[in-house]
Amino acid sequence: MLRNTLRNAPATASIAAICTLVFLAAALQARSLTDVVWDSAVGADTILYGPEIAGPGYLRTLTSGFLHLDITHLFVNMFMLVFVGAEVERFVGTGPFVLAYLAGVLWASTSVLAFSFSTPTAGASGALYTLMAVLIAIAYRRRTDLRAPLILVGVNVAYTLLSPGTVSLWGHLGGLAAGAGMAWPLTSRSMRTRWATGAVALVLACVTIWLLTMPSTVPVH
């Protein structure tokens, strides 16, 4: 079943593999499956944490999207990635999918830096919210029932709003907003438009992160 789901979705499979390997490396260092961040160099060096965003620390805005806090966090996100990501990748194409996914990670990080600067954050869920928004556009393009993707987004947003302090509110909302902005052009019939959408979203996210973390704009805590 898993092989069939990931057929023609190499990027989805690769992202899931990278997330799993990062988790295993952090778990081995921390000697734990339930808290792999602060007792491992892998976790401590890749988690998004605003005060550490400087120089090489900028990579945290990307690497944090491949780090998960515990085994349950990893399993839930990889389950969503495999089934939602594979569907989106098969529709939009592998190249545009990769650009859009990375843009989703960065826009989620952007939102966290803007609204919750000093909150340590990790996980693929911001990018998954991006993909869920795109999934709605795919259903519309196919003229299929919109209820399933709308319910999926609605349930996840409700869970986010009802779970303060346990999930990244701003990461999720930032990823969802990015997906909403990309969804229509990313599902265009034009492959050139799909590539351009992912590329522009990625570049804009990078520029916004840079602007947010300039010395004159970094929040003082």
Question: Where in this protein do the model-derived segments appear?
Answer:
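Alpha-helical transmembrane bundle and helix-membrane interface signal
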Residues: R90-F91, L135-L150, T187-A199
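Alpha-helical transmembrane segments of multi-pass membrane proteins
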Residues: I18-A26, M78, G126-V134, L152-L161, L176-A180, L204-W210
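Hydrophobic alpha-helical transmembrane segments
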Residues: T12-A17, F75, V98-L102, L128, ...
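C-terminal transmembrane module of polytopic alpha-helical membrane proteins
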Residues: M1-R7, L162-H221
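Hydrophobic transmembrane alpha-helices
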Residues: G85, A133-I138, A178-T187
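Membrane-interface micro-motifs in multi-pass membrane enzymes
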Residues: F117-V134, S168-G171
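N-terminal TM1-TM2 helical hairpin plus the immediately adjacent luminal interfacial "cap"
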Residues: N8-A122, P164-V167
